[in-house]
């Protein structure tokens, strides 16, 4: 049997080793395989090798890929294509199927890796880790030619099993090293007693590690320290709090903070924010509000509610007693103005008083009861007349002045002229009689024009006085809007803050402690602003009352002025006509012009200015004393009064006052006419009929005075005036030094005997006056004797003779 088997083996071997006489070419084989595939005999996929001389099935390719991976653990698809001699495309397809069928395999970046491969790699990594205590993932990735993310994915499931270490911040650490770092972090955290920035702590630990191990020491990332610290904090190993992940505040420090804040606040009932900032509390206001919900957070400090209670009690007493209080005087010194304002806003008694109009707050901290303010107002109202308020001329709007020009009330009667002038009345006669010479010379003609005196002209500026008053209501309608817009400004002009403050300090000196008025929001300034409308209302009421009372007084005042002006204007026009006679004698003409300006013009101007000044005051609601005292004004007084008059009237009045210092009476009359028209007064013109009547009355009165005159000195100017009237039919007023020139002018106008006696009388009178001036008090003096002798001659010889001549001529 064995021999037969051996024989069969030899025959098989011979058959196998024998060469066929017929061989198939490669082309034939390819065609044969295609025929078999077409007929379905070969029903599976055949793959060509890269050489093209061999066929391989997909299953066989998969098998060879598995065997290669099993042998190597990690294989690149490119390497498998070269090793197996199969196109890379087919290798990729079959590799994907292999990986899909075997979960222990993975295909990453063109490489197939098995779990066994990673187990082997991680074992090697663990060995290196134990040797070095730390390995960087970047180093592992570089050695394995893979990405760091893949290294992490491979290592994480094997940490604690194959790899004995901890992965943190891209580093692998051994447990012993982690424990050592944990101890360092724990010690550092517990050693810190003040708020500290954690990165700076980690930097210090890194420097310490480098000093311990040198340049070759293990490098530890700050994130590793932070991770360990977070774990310790979570476990409660270290106590404290972390803000923003980097600012560490130890519990011991927070505890010390709370104790310090509580101690300060409980002892002082307040605490400043700067105290908390020194304690390293970053948001002091929020901290205190959370710590003490009942406390009050102010701008600079945090206070206990008891501070409000204390101030509320003080404010309540102040309001109840009708006084004022500065909250800063009650509150502790550490509370400033803005904080005092907020505390006041929290006082119930003050808020209740404000709602019921019992108190008001001025400035940041001053509380005034309305009773106190009313007390000040009442005293100021009583003293309002001492404020020195005057009214803007023509506008009816008052303004304050520091000093007011004060002159006596009414000027003297316009009919009272210089008694030394020709035609002047005797000082010894009664007032009514004295007025007849110059003031009443118009006689019956004035009586006939009584109706005209009561009328006011309506043309041009003559209607100014009444039309202005009548149009005030219309102006109020059209200008009401503008007036309302300017009310505040007008109030300020009437009662300036400085004036009110000065008066307030006068009646309430205790308010001086509030300081000056530089601060526009200061308590004293605000109090003055509060009082201003009250004072304005009181002033307006008083002014309106005074206006209604003054209306009748104004009418009487202006009517009286008009009557006196009518009389004076007619007299001045009458006397002005005599000036034409002396135009050829400039020296005498100048004397007569100045004499009329002084004796007749000045009293008229004084009366007009004083009356218009008084009328302006009455028109604006100011009180004026009624006085008939005659006052002679100086040039400065006239200018001052004229400037106080309103608008264009002031200009005209100043021009009128200036003409008194001039040399022409006609210029004065023109200025007087302009002023009268501007003020609404009537300026009567002297017509022929009135002139004849006045000259007739003047002649009659002057004749009576010459007839009854017994004083030889006073007799001369009267008789000269009478002779001048007889010669030229003109009324004359001349000073004593112009009598000689007048007598010389009469030489050719009167009879020679009369002229001779008149000239003799004049020369004797001049000598008497000269001797009288030279005489001494000694009655035996020779000059006195000669004076008495010549005066006796005047009385006994010349005066009777001259009377006879003049009166005889007058009667004729």
Curated annotation (Swiss-Prot):
EC number: 2.3.2.-
Pfam short name (any one): E3_UFM1_ligase
Disordered: annotated span: 389-495
Listed GO CC annotations: endoplasmic reticulum membrane
UniProt-listed InterPro entries: Ufl1, Ufl1-like_C, Ufl1_dom, Ufl1_N
GO annotation (BP), single: protein ufmylation
Highest taxon listed in the record's lineage: Eukaryota
Keyword list, A-Z: Transferase, Ubl conjugation pathway
GO molecular function, one term: UFM1 ligase activity
Functional summary from the UniProt entry: E3 UFM1-protein ligase that mediates ufmylation of target proteins.
UniProt record similarity statement: Belongs to the UFL1 family.
Designated name of the protein: E3 UFM1-protein ligase 1 homolog
UniProt lineage: Eukaryota, Viridiplantae, Streptophyta, Embryophyta, Tracheophyta
